[in-house]
């Protein structure tokens, strides 16, 4: 395939970053169309990119004959309709999380995609493309720590937008640790419990922050996650896996630290997610572009991964209300080999 022509839908912070990324750092692709519900913003972005134009209707942007593939950086509430349009037009799509905003529509999207001859949807869980997470995954897969037993995670933000509520801490923040757990351990999550510590006095009124999430996988491994999104300090993400023959930690801005081997402590805390995971986003988009041009369409988290994360987070929101462990119920995974393609 020649240069991939990409439509970027939604040019807020994330979408504008993707436009700049594809334009300046990604090979084999260019942005041909942009769309945003704020028309003036889309027109401004388009004017800054050679050969790019703004299209008012997102569905028209997807259907545009000068678009080969789509990046969705629109609000999650719009994803279902836009993803279905991508499937209808057989256009590969990189969809920023969430896949959709509820379990039922996420499952329907996964099922609809499974009816096609090949996958089209990749979900933007960028940590899978982070150098440190990839090293940790390789360490676990290589068996150097023996059987992984427990994982400790920290997810801290300096602050959140004014519309953030307690459930969004689960759906927008914990969702990353949910995918990390499934990625590193290679198994599904069986239950989730959200514990409410004493709330931060600086948190917005009515927002329960911090929260502690306890995940249990189907094999019995436990993961604890500290979620604290109003620290007023910086963006801090840490992950430590404890295995039968040692432990490994990432996220200290000094590379992977092994407690069973000499290591160095120290470093600065990233001020935001763009600084912490900028390279991961670059790798994610480059690998997606390469996959689309090669005809495989995805090289990363699938629509099923998006659905599974939504199911865990739905159980998490239920636990946030009750304080009790809530089982995660997953549907049977669609099998493309047993479904007659559309």
UniProtKB/Swiss-Prot annotation:
GO terms for molecular function: inositol 2-dehydrogenase (NAD+) activity; nucleotide binding. It comes from the Bacteria. It catalyses: myo-inositol + NAD(+) = scyllo-inosose + NADH + H(+). GO terms for biological process: inositol catabolic process. SUPFAM superfamilies: Glyceraldehyde-3-phosphate dehydrogenase-like, C-terminal domain, NAD(P)-binding Rossmann-fold domains. Keywords: NAD, Oxidoreductase. The keyword Oxidoreductase applies. Its EC number is 1.1.1.18. The keyword Oxidoreductase applies. Gene3D superfamilies: Dihydrodipicolinate Reductase, domain 2, NAD(P)-binding Rossmann-like Domain. Belongs to the Gfo/Idh/MocA family. Homotetramer. Involved in the oxidation of myo-inositol (MI) to 2-keto-myo-inositol (2KMI or 2-inosose). PANTHER family: INOSITOL 2-DEHYDROGENASE (PTHR43593:SF1), PTHR43593. This is Inositol 2-dehydrogenase 2. It comes from Mycolicibacterium vanbaalenii (strain DSM 7251 / JCM 13017 / BCRC 16820 / KCTC 9966 / NRRL B-24157 / PYR-1) (Mycobacterium vanbaalenii). The gene is iolG2.
């Amino acid at each position: 395939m020649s240069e991939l022509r990409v439509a970027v839908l939604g040019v807020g912070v994330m979408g504008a970053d993707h436009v700049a990324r594809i334009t300046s750092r990604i090979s084999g692709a260019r942005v041909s169309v942009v769309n945003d519900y704020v028309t003036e913003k889309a027109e401004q972005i388009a004017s800054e990119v050679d050969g790019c134009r703004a299209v008012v209707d997102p569905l028209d942007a997807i259907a545009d004959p000068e678009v080969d593939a789509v990046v969705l950086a629109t609000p999650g509430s719009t994803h279902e309709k836009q993803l279905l349009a991508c499937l209808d037009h057989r256009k590969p799509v990189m969809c920023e999380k969430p896949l959709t905003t509820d379990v039922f529509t996420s499952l329907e999207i996964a099922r609809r995609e499974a009816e096609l001859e090949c996958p089209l949807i990749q979900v933007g869980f960028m940590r899978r493309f982070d150098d440190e997470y990839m090293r940790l995954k390789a360490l676990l897969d290589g068996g150097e720590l023996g059987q992984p037993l427990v994982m400790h995670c920290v997810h801290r933000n300096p602050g959140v937008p004014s519309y953030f509520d307690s459930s969004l801490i689960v759906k927008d923040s914990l969702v990353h640790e949910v995918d990390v757990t499934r990625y590193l351990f290679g198994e599904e999550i069986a239950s989730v419990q959200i514990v409410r510590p004493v709330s931060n006095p600086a948190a917005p009124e009515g927002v329960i922050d911090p929260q502690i999430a306890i995940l249990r996988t189907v094999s019995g491994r436990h993961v604890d996650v500290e979620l604290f999104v109003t620290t007023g300090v910086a963006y801090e993400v840490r992950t430590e896996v404890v295995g039968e023959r040692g432990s490994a930690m990432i996220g200290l801005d000094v590379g992977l630290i092994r407690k069973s081997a000499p290591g160095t402590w120290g470093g600065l805390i990233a001020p935001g997610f763009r600084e912490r995971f900028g390279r991961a986003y670059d790798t994610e988009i480059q690998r997606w572009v390469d996959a689309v041009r090669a005809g495989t369409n995805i090289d990363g988290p699938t629509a099923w991964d998006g659905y599974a994360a939504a199911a865990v987070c739905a159980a998490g929101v239920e636990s946030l209300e009750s304080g009790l462990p809530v089982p995660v119920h997953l549907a049977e995974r669609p099998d493309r080999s047993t479904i007659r393609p559309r």
